[in-house]
Each structure stands twice: as structure tokens, then as C-alpha cells.
């Protein structure tokens, strides 16, 4: 029997990717998305999905037997990094989520958002619980993608799917980079603004926008006795020579490794796909309705949709708890 899956704020169809990994072939996927680039990537990957555009069109499914309702409603109204206006932000769709849950009465549901202020979290918890018509609170569970990928990404998940305990998969950042060197096991969270690029100042002072370092063919020959991040302790040699360690005043930000020059770069879109455990090159192409053919997706749009997306390994683990999968 075909199962109806409704994905609000579908993005690039991360939910479908997770269902694929569970060998779900008997689904009718109903997608709601307005971002044309993310929708194009989804359309290219899943041409048979039924598309409704705006999530407010969830009413199109009233009367249907919805098996799974899921969605990652916009995080900007709740993000600690943003203004955090919550339901006072015009981008907030939490009430829509409550209405859809109440109106469609799915067998299973899964909603996701960023960690937020406790009063905002409670409001969403109460809204979902009231929509379900139950006196028991549907408390969210916090999961860090770091246990499932090389990516530090804490998210809240509200669901009625039983979630089993899990173990760290042991995936680290060096496992997913194409080339270069990294100074930590887990990447900083990649968000929708990653396309704007990072800098050493932002990286070390604000712990944002993961960088990859290029030592121009250097190999590590030891560590200097310095306090601070590993990246400033390493001593390298090039062409068989060990340059003297440069000493500068100014604390941990100033001492550098003993190469003539340390180069850095941002993560590539491919590496961001791997952080989100999305298949390699999944976001490379999209099928655009207005042109009627496939076109490459720009790096900036790839970064954006990956930053807005889900970690597929996490979603797969959650959906495994559906008893009849």
C-alpha cells in the first residue's frame, strides 16, 4: 500500500533521501517548497514527487490518509544568532505546522528547528501537543549531528516516532575533506550564510565558518610548546628544511606554524554535502520549470540549501523508529 508522505518546507528533499536509505519505495511524496533552487535540485532527483509550492497549501491534502508529516520550519525567527522574535517574526511558520498537524492527523510526524530560548521551545511544544489533542507534552529531543557526521550541528526534533539510543559513528572532519589539513575533529556548524565565506578572525575569535588549511606541501615534523589551538602548535618542514618558528607578540592569535605562509580555504560544496551526509554532488544540478531543462547550481545556492538542510544520517536514524518501515 502506498504511503503518503507530506514534507512542509521540503528544501532539497532531505526527508526523501532519508526514506531512500530505509528502502522506502512505496511512498507518494508530497513536497511543499518555494525556494526555486532547492526545489530544482529536488525535482532533478525526484521527478515523480507531487509539488504544491508554498507550505500554506497543506490544505490540498485534507481528507487524505497522511502516513508521515515532516518539516524543518524556518529557523531564523528562533536562532540565537538572529533577532529571535519567534512568532513575532513574519517568517515564522510554527502556527502553520500546528494547523497542518491538527488538520491532517498523520500517523507519524517529525519537525525540526534550532536550539532556542526555553520559552520559545515551550510554546512550540505546547502548540504541537494541543494540535495532537493530548495532555502529554511532546517534548523535543536534542541531537547533535556530530554523532552521525563530521559536523557539529545541534538541532531540536519534535516527533512521535520512538528514537532508539545511538552510538557515535566516529566520522571526523579529516575523513571528508578533499585535500588540505584541518585542526579539529568536528566542523563548526555550516549555516545558510556559509557562501559569504570565512576568515581567520571569524574562525578563531567567533568559532564560525569552518576553514581548511593548505600547507603547500609541508609535512609536520613536531609541535611547538605554545598555548592555544593545535593549528598554531605545529612545526612543518618544506624541501627538507625546518624553518625557524616565528615569534610575535599578541597572545594565541599571533604565533604561527613554521611555514613561510599558511594558506586557508573554505569548505567546498562537496565537503558540505559530506558534512550533511548528503550523496556526493547531489546539489550540483537542478531541473528548472521555467527553462524546462537541467542546469548547474551555483556554489552560493548549494551552500545555502545545505546550510538550511538536514543531516541525512540523523533523519534516517529517527525514521527507522517507524514500526512499519
What are these regions (language model features)?
Residues 1-5:
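Extreme N-terminal starter segment of soluble prokaryotic enzymes
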Residues 8-13:
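Class I SAM-dependent methyltransferase "Motif I" SAM/SAH-binding loop
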Residues 42:
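Conserved SAM-binding loop
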Amino acid at each position: 500500500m502506498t504511503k503518503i508522505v507530506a514534507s512542509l518546507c521540503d528544501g532539497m528533499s532531505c526527508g526523501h533521501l532519508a526514506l531512500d536509505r530505509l528502502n522506502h519505495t512505496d511512498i507518494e511524496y508530497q513536497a511543499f517548497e518555494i525556494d526555486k533552487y532547492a526545489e530544482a535540485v529536488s525535482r532533478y532527483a525526484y521527478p515523480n514527487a507531487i509539488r504544491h509550492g508554498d507550505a500554506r497549501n497543506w490544505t490540498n491534502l485534507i481528507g487524505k490518509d497522511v502516513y508521515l508529516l515532516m518539516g524543518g520550519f524556518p529557523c531564523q525567527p528562533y536562532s540565537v544568532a538572529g533577532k529571535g522574535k519567534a512568532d513575532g517574526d513574519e517568517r515564522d511558520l510554527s502556527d502553520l505546522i500546528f494547523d497542518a498537524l491538527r488538520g491532517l492527523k498523520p500517523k507519524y510526524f517529525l519537525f525540526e528547528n534550532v536550539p532556542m530560548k526555553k520559552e520559545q521551545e515551550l510554546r512550540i511544544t505546547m502548540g504541537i501537543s494541543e494540535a495532537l489533542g493530548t495532555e502529554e507534552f511532546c517534548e523535543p529531543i536534542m541531537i547533535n549531528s556530530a554523532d552521525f557526521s563530521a559536523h557539529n550541528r545541534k538541532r531540536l526534533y519534535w516527533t512521535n516516532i520512538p528514537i532508539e539510543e545511538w552510538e557515535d559513528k566516529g566520522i571526523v572532519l579529516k575523513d571528508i575533506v578533499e585535500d588540505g589539513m584541518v585542526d579539529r575533529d568536528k566542523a563548526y556548524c555550516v549555516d545558510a550564510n556559509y557562501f559569504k565565506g570565512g576568515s581567520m578572525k571569524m574562525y578563531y575569535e567567533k568559532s564560525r565558518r569552518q576553514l581548511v588549511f593548505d600547507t603547500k606541501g609541508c609535512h609536520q615534523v613536531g609541535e611547538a610548546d605554545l598555548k592555544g589551538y593545535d593549528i598554531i602548535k605545529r612545526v612543518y618542514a618544506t624541501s627538507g628544511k625546518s624553518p625557524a618558528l616565528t615569534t610575535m607578540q599578541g597572545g594565541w592569535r599571533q604565533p604561527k606554524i613554521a611555514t613561510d605562509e599558511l594558506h586557508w580555504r573554505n569548505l567546498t560544496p562537496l565537503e558540505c554535502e559530506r558534512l550533511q551526509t548528503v550523496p556526493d554532488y547531489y546539489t550540483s544540478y537542478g531541473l528548472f520549470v521555467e527553462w524546462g531543462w537541467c542546469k548547474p547550481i551555483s556554489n552560493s545556492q548549494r551552500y545555502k540549501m545545505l546550510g538550511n538542510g538536514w543531516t541525512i544520517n540523523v533523519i534516517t536514524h529517527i525514521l527507522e523508529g517507524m514500526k512499519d518501515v
